[in-house]
Amino acid sequence: MTNKEKALELIGTFVSGDSVKAKKLLAKDYIQHNLAYGTGADAFIGAVEYLASSPVKTTVNNIRAFEDGDKVFLHTVYNFAGTGEQVAFDIFRFDADGKIAEHWDNLAAKAEVNPSGHTQIDGTLEKKNVDREETRKVVSEFVGDVLRGENLDKFASYFDGDNYIQHNTAIADGVSGVGAALEAMAKQGIQMIYNKTHFVLADGDYALAVSEGSFAGAATTFYDLFRVENGKIAEHWDVMETLADKATWQNQNGKF
């Protein structure tokens, strides 16, 4: 079984309630960075058993799955025990024994279509067999130059004219859509700041950048998935999550 298959099996236990399978897949000292859950394999297994006992069943719909070295990253829609659909990016790290040893994620409520009629999950599904390192390089440089604001003069150079498919819930397609959204935010005094990027994971023509910063003054984590075409940024999906108050954390591992 590939690591990607193992990760999909693990999230499937939220539906099946198969705690035995979850235990087999997880390293005992599993490190959890979702701050709403305890750390360790036992805490994960407890969540599986709790969801299995709920009168409203959990649903899991994986949309995209990728692998990069010892990490798998997934784009999935969850509905935990009928609490409402959430769009998530999950990252799982595998240890030398092939066990799932660490997990990071970002979740956001599923929203209505954006100004261009796209959802948070639709769009291109096919993955092209191109050099992941080229993809990683383009996305890493874009995140630094543009999202972290280190060289904003290069903004337009990352796109093929105004061709850019946008899945952010509030922004329209095109470079022009980004410009209009930033202008509207500025008028409202809203700043979106990327301070540090922790991961840029790549598989084929897709790369997921994981960053921290702030949105409208609140500490925020940003998961941005990009599809690269002919060396240009062609499509974007994202999940932003406000960092929970530390007093509510169920583990002390931090978001990263």
Describe each region flagged by the PLM.
Residues 1-256:
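C-terminal and inter-domain tail/linker signature
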